[in-house]
């Protein structure tokens, strides 16, 4: 068990749908950290003359981190989304979907590097500006044990991750495919959070606090080299009590003269 090393990866996708009182969609807003994807969404909206689809240029996403015990490993990551878009704020209802990515590393007992996805679906059921706070812990979810090796297991590559969508997405809505694909992986990250909602003056804000566990439980299988490396210790602890018992029996036989000997000593 060890504390994972976690950082914000600065990649995100935001998709907001607004509704009227009868739950009819009135608009869609999209924004991401990928300029190519933003262009695709903008072109789709303009070519289809869909005045209800908008690129959410007012979106502002920032992040911060906290190392409470000064050990060089983040204990908390904070991600903030904020907008002053009237079309979103004044809508009767809205549904906010936010996907962002983290960098996650284990380096001691097992060596694991991955770029996990966090998917949030946040409904807001009334009108007006809001401050929404999410606070929770991340949890490593495993469908199978990790094979412990001396080579780092790269589930995703930082330089060419699966969310590098320049050549993989034909529309902004295809990210559902990648999210469903991500959910089926052997190792994923789950964000267990509580939600608190308050009225605000003029902006819609989402504050996401991610607490990083001090000890992350990991299920893994030892490699054959690791097994051989520590096998002699197991044999030693098994044969040590047997050796002590045999020695005590031998000592008892000698001291009790159970077997007579013809060896004569001049001492």
Model-derived segments and spans:
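Non-cytosolic ectodomains/luminal loops of secretory-pathway membrane proteins
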Residues: 2-219
């Amino acid at each position: 068990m060890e504390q994972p090393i976690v950082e914000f990866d600065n990649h995100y996708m935001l998709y907001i749908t607004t509704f009227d009182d009868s739950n009819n969609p009135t608009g869609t807003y999209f924004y991401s950290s990928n300029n190519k994807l933003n262009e695709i969404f903008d072109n789709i909206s303009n070519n289809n003359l869909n005045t209800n689809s908008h690129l959410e240029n007012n979106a502002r996403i920032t992040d911060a981190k906290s190392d409470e015990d000064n050990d060089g490993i983040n204990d908390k990551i904070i991600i903030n989304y904020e907008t002053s878009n009237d079309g979103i704020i004044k809508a009767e209802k809205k549904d906010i979907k936010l996907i962002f990515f983290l960098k996650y590393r284990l380096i001691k007992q097992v060596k694991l590097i991955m770029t996990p996805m966090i998917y949030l679906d946040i409904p807001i059921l009334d009108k007006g500006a809001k401050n929404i706070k999410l606070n929770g812990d991340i949890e490593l979810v495993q469908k199978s044990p990790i094979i412990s090796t001396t080579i780092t297991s790269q589930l995703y590559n930082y330089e060419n991750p699966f969310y590098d969508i320049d050549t993989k997405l034909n529309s902004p809505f295809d990210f559902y495919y990648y999210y469903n694909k991500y959910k089926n992986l052997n190792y994923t990250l789950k964000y267990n959070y509580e939600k608190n909602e308050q009225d605000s003056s003029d902006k819609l804000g989402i504050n996401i606090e991610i607490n990083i566990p001090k000890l992350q439980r990991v299920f893994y299988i030892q490699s054959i080299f690791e097994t051989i490396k520590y096998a002699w210790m197991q044999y030693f602890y098994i044969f040590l009590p047997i050796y002590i018992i045999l020695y005590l029996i031998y000592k008892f036989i000698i001291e009790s003269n159970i077997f007579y000997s013809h060896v004569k000593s001049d001492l």
